[in-house]
Curated annotation (Swiss-Prot):
Protein name: GTPase Obg
InterPro entries: G_OBG, GTP-bd, GTP-bd_Obg/CgtA, GTP1-OBG_CS, GTP1_OBG_dom, GTP1_OBG_dom_sf, OBG_GTPase, P-loop_NTPase
Subcellular location: Cytoplasm
Database matches in Pfam families: GTP1_OBG (PF01018), MMR_HSR1 (PF01926)
EC number: 3.6.5.-
Domain OBG-type G: 159-339
Cellular component terms (Gene Ontology): cytoplasm
Keywords from the named record: Cytoplasm, GTP-binding, Hydrolase, Magnesium, Metal-binding, Nucleotide-binding
PROSITE patterns for the chain: G_OBG (PS51710), GTP1_OBG (PS00905), OBG (PS51883)
Span of domain Obg: 1-158
PANTHER family to which the protein is assigned, alphabetical: DEVELOPMENTALLY REGULATED GTP-BINDING PROTEIN-RELATED, MITOCHONDRIAL RIBOSOME-ASSOCIATED GTPASE 2
Family designation: Belongs to the TRAFAC class OBG-HflX-like GTPase superfamily. OBG GTPase family.
Length: 350
């Protein structure tokens, strides 16, 4: 089950109370104070783990709390610290305040550990309150309460390449033949109901991650179809690959324009992202010479449109996932784009 958003209350542990205690030994009838301190409450810590892929472990849970600190004891024994609660989440998880929508944490790297809520401090035992005018203090501090916060955990997949296209255009077939992902494939719309990640090995030394996002339909940015719920996942991809289907009644140019408009409505930043275009099912030209000519005209119209909008950054390639033609060229094209983006990112962060 793919769970990508959960609402939950998180609370760190309360500090244990300090002890009120006095020495009780033979021949010492009025022993001084020996109350120990309370233990600190446990912390809430987020841990990013790429072996975890969804937020399903949080499903159905309304509240998670770290352990409270133990109370102090006599003979100056301090209470034990409460156990921390470590929450394991997949890469791409954001922790968002439900009331303000502020992003509190953004977990993007394997092994990343972030302290989220600090446990309450334990109270001081009565030993600390002995002074010249009060040799036998009969009070100690209570522990400080832990922190509590209502948050929403949201998972946005992190990938190098995000596949963008209408339902049933060949995205799942593509990712199944170029990567280790095994999505469900069938000849009907919305086969892909959840995002899928696949590792694409280009050669012995180079690879990248590709994301198959459920198909977008016109109006997805307004909530139609399955697209809106998963458009956010495309935000975490570095490069977009539009997958267009020559077998659809809608011309290739129109497919591209509609898809781009949906991205623009959802996010201006996403609209301006670098992209490539893949014409899928190139083996369909075998359906006849007339059909092949129509596809060629369609592609030419799209190519001219790309020149009109002055977008020299994009590439256009024909691929058949079934016959495995054009796949090698596509992988190397994508790798070059990703390398450029990675290098630019390094330059920006120096």
């Amino acid at each position: 089950m793919f769970i990508d958003s959960v609402k939950i209350t998180l609370a760190s542990g309360d500090g244990g109370k300090g002890a009120v205690s006095f020495r009780r030994e033979k021949h010492v009838p009025l022993g001084g104070p020996d109350g120990g301190d309370g233990g600190n409450g446990g912390d809430i810590i987020f841990v990013c783990d790429n072996n975890t892929h969804t937020l399903v472990n949080f499903k159905g849970k309304r509240e998670l709390r770290a352990q409270n600190g133990a109370g102090g004891m006599g003979r100056n024994k301090n209470g034990k610290k409460g156990e921390n609660l470590e929450l394991i989440v997949p890469e791409g998880t954001q922790v968002i305040d439900v009331q303000t929508n502020e992003i509190l944490l953004d977990l993007t790297k394997e092994g990343q550990r972030e302290l989220f809520l600090k446990g309450g401090k334990g109270g001081l035992g009565n030993t600390h309150f002995k002074h010249a005018t009060n040799q036998r203090p009969d009070y100690a501090q209570p522990g400080i309460k832990g922190e509590s916060r209502l948050v929403r955990l949201e998972l946005k997949l992190i990938a190098d390449v995000g596949l963008v296209g209408f339902p049933n255009v060949g995205k799942s077939t593509l990712i199944s033949v170029v990567s280790n992902a095994k999505p469900e494939i069938a000849n009907y719309e919305f086969t892909t109901l959840t995002p899928k990640l696949g590792l694409v090995d280009v050669d012995e030394y180079n690879s990248f991650v590709m994301a198959d996002i459920p198909g977008i339909i016109e109006g997805a940015s307004g909530g139609k179809g399955l697209g809106l719920a998963f458009l956010k996942h495309i935000e975490r991809t570095s490069f977009l690959l539009f997958v267009l289907d020559p077998m659809r009644q809608m011309p290739l140019k129109e497919q591209f324009i509609v898809l781009r408009k949906e991205l623009e409505k959802f996010s201006n930043e996403l609209f301006g992202r670098k992209f490539g275009i893949m014409i899928s099912k190139s083996d369909s030209v075998r359906l006849g010479e007339e059909f092949a000519e129509q596809i060629a005209l369609n592609i030419n119209e799209l190519d001219n449109y790309l020149k009109e909008i002055n977008n020299p950054q994009s590439f256009l390639i024909k691929v058949s996932s079934l016959e495995k033609t054009g796949l090698k060229e596509l992988k190397f094209m994508l790798l070059e784009e990703i390398k450029t983006l990675r290098n630019n990112k390094k330059i920006l962060t120096i």
